[in-house]
């Protein structure tokens, strides 16, 4: 098969038959966890894209390109700011080396290219037009003669190029209404051709194709050598494979085509292009050469086939024998197809479908070929590997190429082509940023930029910086949350972690490289910490202090703002303290006693009954305590010793006094985070609320969480909620203000359904439920800024980070032995 490409101009490829194809990259769309309705929407868009071409040819390619891990990591380094820049860059470099040693310099990245044959507009026949056509024909003949004699240059008429460019603009406008596309350029074509001829190890984004042109007034010249340069290699054709030798290695390639489709490909579940990305651990390429058969021609072909089948039926009847079931079934299908074509006036499509499998040696090629055949077998598609036709099928992958074999044509409808899932993939996260792990379905690295949401990025479905980590105990919530906070701090963020279980107390020892920027505030019940959590001490603004004092005292005493007798008395006492010189919660008790009424004395006694608990004196001061908690370091951790948090199942009415005091302290600390949020707006900040459910269950906590989230959005701060159930976050206002979401393993079916609904995916779909139930430690469902949902494995890479963030109790050595 001769090399088909005659000339390349931007995204236009001219072949030697006078045809011109316009090629585009179909920017992949996320297909994972879509509901059937959403899948049908994509299907209809693609069907209309194909059906709008009433005539001509379409060439669709799924190509396994390579993307550079090192380049992504280097781009990530550009995102780093702040005091820990040197530490972060060293960490990213170590990450890069570890990733490259595990998976190599490049990762497989599937790209989708689609080419449409441009049809010349029918123009009125005029003398001027006739003369122009004659002139073009003569010049083409002369160029062909020159080319045959000299063979050095290819000449292309500028007028011809300009005419096709005008048509391509109209086509691009039509396509881009339905899908995001990018016009290809010479570098794309160069990479594609070199890839087909055995080139490996080059990252797609680093590749350059040198194709100089010389433009004259009437024509443009290009060296023929430059056009065929990407095909440089030694090809040895065998009956069942090609041996392609390049300077840096040898590749063996085998080609399959469809022999027959023996059953129905039911949509959704027939998306071959989508599922084969997940199925195979090795790269494969696929080509679809589609010739459009106009409706009239298709009807004529179908009716001729119908006559043949009827003849067979009559022949059997005349010979007193039964018509075979194959003929009867075929007649039914033909009748159905005829009525469909007649009613819809749609075209039919001649499909030549070729799959390319490559391997470094013959043994591996054989194994891969068997795997590909088995995969297609399961979908009722029988593949065949034609003897002696490998080079011809190889040629079908080249841009603007012709169909090589007519023996394996499948007549299909636009519905069938749309149901193959062309362009569907699983995309998660950002192209660069914090490396958090990899997608379990595609194996691709996943990067996040936690501060990006507020920038209003194109395509994002949220501008909320807040994030949620949900899941049952031991699934990896705290670990993954710690990892994201740690890397965010390295990348320049400032963090405040509320650590009620005191799990992060050893971070200065376990994270020595950033120990100088870690500040651990451990509030024990010692005398020197007395009153540090008093609302009047911890908050700078007196108004904020007053508001927090009301929240805490109503929470502890159970006095509702709707209580017409007690609430006004308490409110009056708090306001009096706010307006006085010496401010503290003990002063509120004094103010209530000074009131002298039965109600005020009763409230004073009630509040005072809390003050003699072990660590309650953290909450109460008499106005002589000064604020000494500093949050100036990059990573600040606040711990309160001896906190007793209620169980998740305990209702608010059943809280013990210790539990009430513990939750009250968490509310104070979390409100203190408001002051932290209102610092420098140019620095991204994180407020991390571990065990957030404990205060999200009470009214004061819910109000506070919304305050934090709203302030965070305005002041460039993300509030991270780490909690066990989505119920805690299902308040509509809060739910709509969450950006990134992570859900870890859950076994309770009701919780699973709620989590799936929280992620906006079909909660009744059994496959979705099974995926969430079967997650292993460190694996989670993620929803990114663009609303894309997938399953990832968190990957800390470094053992020291794993040990630092691991919250499991240590195993005794004797047990191990």
Regions found by a protein language model. Name each.
Residues 1-411, 422:
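Extended, folded cores of ATP/NTP-driven motor/assembly subunits in large transport
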Residues 36-54, 65, 277-280, 293-300, ...:
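P-loop NTPase motor domains
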Residues 54-57, 110, 491-493, 715-717, ...:
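Short glycine-/polar-rich loops that comprise or flank the Walker A/P-loop
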Residues 101-102, 541-587, 729-817:
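P-loop NTPase motor core of the ASCE superfamily
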Residues 126, 440-446, 451-453, 458-471, ...:
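Charge-patterned, long linear interaction tracts outside catalytic cores
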Residues 313-315, 451-485, 498-505, 521-526, ...:
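Conserved P-loop NTPase motor cores
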Residues 486-496, 509, 515:
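Post-Walker A helix-loop "phosphate-sensing" segment adjacent to the P-loop in P-loop NTPases
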Residues 514-516, 737:
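Short, structured coil segments at secondary-structure junctions
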């Amino acid at each position: 098969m001769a090399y088909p490409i005659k000339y390349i101009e931007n995204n236009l490829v001219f072949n030697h038959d006078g045809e011109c194809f316009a090629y585009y990259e179909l920017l992949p769309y996320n297909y994972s966890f879509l509901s059937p309705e959403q899948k049908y929407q994509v299907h209809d868009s693609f069907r209309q894209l194909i059906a709008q071409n009433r005539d001509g040819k379409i060439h669709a390619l799924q190509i396994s390109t390579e993307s550079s891990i090192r380049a992504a990591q280097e781009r990530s380094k550009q995102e780093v700011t702040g005091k820990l820049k040197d530490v972060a860059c060293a960490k990213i470099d170590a990450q890069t080396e570890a990733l490259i040693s595990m998976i190599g310099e490049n990762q497989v990245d599937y790209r989708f290219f689609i080419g449409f044959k441009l049809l010349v507009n029918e123009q009125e026949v005029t003398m001027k037009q006739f003369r122009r056509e004659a002139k073009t024909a003569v010049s083409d003949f002369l160029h062909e003669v020159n080319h045959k004699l000299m063979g050095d240059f290819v000449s292309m008429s500028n007028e011809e190029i300009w005419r096709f460019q005008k048509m391509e603009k109209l086509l691009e406008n039509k396509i881009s209404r339905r899908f995001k596309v990018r016009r290809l350029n010479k570098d794309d074509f160069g990479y594609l051709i070199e890839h087909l001829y055995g080139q490996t190890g080059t990252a797609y984004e680093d590749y350059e194709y040198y194709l100089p042109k010389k433009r004259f007034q009437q024509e443009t010249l290009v060296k023929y050598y430059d056009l065929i340069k990407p095909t440089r290699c030694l090809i040895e054709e065998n009956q069942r494979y090609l041996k392609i030798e390049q300077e840096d290695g040898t590749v063996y390639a085998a080609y399959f085509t469809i022999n027959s489709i023996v059953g129905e490909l039911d949509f959704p579940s027939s998306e071959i292009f989508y599922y084969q990305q997940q199925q195979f651990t090795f790269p494969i390429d696929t080509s679809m050469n589609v010739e459009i058969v106009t409706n009239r021609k298709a009807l004529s072909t179908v009716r001729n086939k119908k006559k043949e089948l009827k003849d067979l039926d009559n022949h059997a009847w005349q010979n007193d024998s039964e018509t075979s079931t194959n003929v009867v079934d075929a007649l039914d299908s033909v009748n159905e197809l005829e009525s469909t074509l007649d009613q819809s006036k749609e075209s039919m499509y001649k499909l030549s479908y070729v799959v390319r499998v490559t391997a470094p040696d013959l043994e591996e090629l054989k194994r891969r070929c068997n795997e590909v055949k088995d995969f297609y077998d399961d979908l009722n598609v029988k593949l065949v590997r034609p003897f002696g036709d490998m080079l011809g099928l190889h040629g079908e992958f080249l841009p603007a190429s012709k169909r090589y074999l007519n023996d394996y044509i499948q007549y299909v409808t636009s519905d069938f082509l749309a149901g193959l899932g062309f362009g569907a993939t699983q995309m998660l996260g950002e192209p660069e940023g914090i490396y958090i792990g990899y997608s379990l379905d595609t194996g691709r690295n996943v990067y996040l930029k936690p501060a990006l949401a507020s920038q209003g990025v194109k395509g994002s479905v949220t501008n909320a910086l807040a994030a949620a980590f949900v899941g049952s105990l031991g699934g990896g919530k705290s670990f993954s949350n710690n990892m994201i906070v740690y890397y965010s701090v390295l990348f320049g963020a400032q963090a405040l972690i509320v650590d009620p279980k005191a799990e992060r107390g050893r971070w200065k020892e376990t994270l020595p490289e950033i120990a100088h920027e870690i500040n651990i505030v451990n509030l024990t019940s010692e005398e020197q910490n007395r009153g540090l959590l008093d609302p009047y001490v911890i908050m700078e603004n007196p108004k904020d202090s007053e508001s927090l004092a009301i929240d805490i005292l109503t929470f502890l005493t159970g006095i509702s703002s709707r209580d017409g007798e007690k609430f006004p008395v308490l409110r009056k006492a708090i306001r009096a303290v706010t307006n006085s010189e010496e401010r503290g919660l003990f002063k509120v008790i004094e103010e209530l006693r000074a009131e002298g009424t039965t109600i005020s004395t009763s409230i004073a006694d009630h509040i005072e009954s809390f003050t003699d608990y072990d660590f309650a004196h953290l909450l109460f001061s008499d106005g002589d305590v000064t604020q000494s908690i500093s949050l100036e370091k990059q990573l600040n951790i606040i711990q309160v010793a001896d906190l007793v948090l209620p169980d998740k199942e305990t209702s608010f009415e059943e809280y013990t006094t210790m539990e009430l005091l513990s939750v009250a302290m968490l509310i104070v600390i979390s409100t203190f985070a408001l002051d932290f949020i209102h610092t420098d707006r140019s620095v991204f900040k994180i407020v991390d609320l571990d065990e957030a459910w404990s205060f999200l269950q009470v009214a004061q906590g819910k109000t506070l969480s919304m305050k934090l989230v709203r302030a965070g959005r305005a002041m460039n701060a993300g509030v991270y909620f780490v909690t066990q159930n989505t119920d805690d976050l299902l308040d509509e206002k809060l739910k709509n203000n969450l950006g990134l979401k992570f859900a870890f393993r859950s076994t309770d079916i009701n919780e699973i359904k709620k989590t799936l609904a929280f992620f906006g995916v079909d909660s009744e779909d059994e496959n979705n439920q099974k995926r969430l139930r079967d997650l292993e430690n460190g694996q989670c469902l993620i929803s990114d800024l663009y609303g894309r949902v997938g399953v990832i494995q968190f990957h800390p890479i470094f053992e020291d980070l794993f040990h630092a963030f691991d919250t499991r109790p240590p195993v005794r050595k004797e047990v191990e032995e």
